[in-house]
Every structure is written in structure tokens, then in C-alpha cells.
UniProtKB/Swiss-Prot annotation:
InterPro entries: 16SrRNA_methylTrfase_J, SAM-dependent_MTases_sf
Keyword Methyltransferase: yes
Annotated function: Specifically methylates the guanosine in position 1516 of 16S rRNA.
tRNA processing as UniProt keyword: no
Family listed: Belongs to the methyltransferase superfamily. RsmJ family.
Gene Ontology MF terms: rRNA (guanine-N2-)-methyltransferase activity
Listed EC numbers: 2.1.1.242
Main enzyme class: transferase
Residues that coordinate or bind S-adenosyl-L-methionine: E125, R126, D179
Name listed for the protein in its UniProt record: Ribosomal RNA small subunit methyltransferase J
Main subcellular location: cytoplasm
Subcellular location(s) per record: Cytoplasm
Gene: rsmJ
CC annotations in GO: cytoplasm
Species of origin: Pseudomonas fluorescens (strain Pf0-1)
Amino acid sequence: MIEQPAACRIHVEALGPTFEAQAEQWAQRLNLPLQVADGEFALQVGEQGLQLQQLGPDAPGPVRVDFVEGGAAHRRLYGGGSGQMIAKAVGIAQGVRPRVLDATAGLGKDAFVLASLGCEMSLIERQPLIGALLEDGLARAAEDFDVAPIVARMKLLKGNSIEVMRNWEGEPPQVIYLDPMFPHREKTALVKKEMRLFRPLVGDDPDAPALLEAALALATHRVVVKRPRKAPCIEGPKPSHALDGKSSRYDIYPKKALKA
């Protein structure tokens, strides 16, 4: 069953007869109904792939994962390369491209940036609905000539991040990247469409301290936690230092140096 607050009513919807079979497959996989009268969210299947649409008169537009066009393409082409703060945070340097686990993958935007810079990425997304969007986006990107080599470096894992890390099999990641959902209490803050859409489904991350603990136990070289710039550190061990941006920062928990 979908991991979600009970109040959320979600159904799967085909945006045309040609997508009905795919819609039925997603409904079965996610244990969701097809077309209900009073739904709050619709997981829609159409020409542009899988998208999540909040329903109602004031709802924002649909959210989908698109690594080929839009913001992901612009950041890939003009985003600053290895000079980006996230690249510095995970330890990318000349001759150094660490193996990274993004344990809070979401829509995969940060993981895609790191993969485009040459990192081998593992991604964990615990919310099945968001995981479905990410899986669909990766599959469509794999068909694009320019982007296929990048997403080939992105391996999607399903499940609870803490449990996956505690029971990790095989070679451990050198770096683990965490971006847990943080409570936005400022009523005037402009929250991105994705966050407004996902918060009712996912909620905040009260288990962030356990997430950090599991990451520190598994990563061989460092753990990086992305936080709102003025937010407190995650409860537990303190970071050795942080990289500050305009709206967010990266708390760094080093274990040993990354070398070429």
C-alpha cells in the first residue's frame, strides 16, 4: 500500500484511450484505484509520461520528472559544472568523481546534476508515488541520445532509506547525500510547486536523525546534508563545516579524504 497520510485520496487516470493499459498497470503496481469522483490527487498517464496532478480550483499544474528538457537541461548545459556548490559539497575535484548515494532522491534533480558531472549515483525514494514519477522520468531519459549516458549512471532503489542503508549489500557508497523534508513554517515563503504538492503526501521527515545516523554508519568518506540556510543542523553529531548559499547550505560530515 502507498505510504501516505490517510486523508489523501489518490487515483490513476489515463489521459486518453491509448494510455488506459498503462494506467491500469500503474494502478495495480501502486495499489491505487482508477478514476474516483472525489479524489484529491490524480496520477495521470499521457503523452508526456507520468505526472501527478493535484485536483481542485486552486491547484498548481502537474509535476513530472523531465531530465531532457526544461530546468534539468538548462542546469546541465549552463549550471556551472564542477564549480556548483553541490559538486564541491560531495567532493568532486580534478580526478575525483565519488560514488554517491542520494538517500532522499525526490524528483532526482540533485542526483541528475551529480550524474551529469560523472558520479555513479544510487538513488533511494521511499514514497512509492514519487518513486513512480522518478522511474518514468529515467525511462524516458534513457531514450534520449544526449541524456541516456547520464541516466545510465543513476540506479533507482525503492524502499525506506534507513532500512536500505542499514541492510546495504555490496560496495558501500563513498558519499551519502541527504536532503530531508524540512518544515516550512513561514506563511509568506514562496514554496516551489513540487513542495506544495508533495507535502500533503510525504509530510516532513521526523526521522532525519535516524537517517543521518544510518548514513554516517554506511558512507566510507563523507555525508552531506542539504538544509535551508537558517535551519538548525539535524539532531546528532555536528558537521565539521558547511557551505552556505543564498537560500540553502550543505552541512559536511567528513570521515576520510577523497583522493584521485
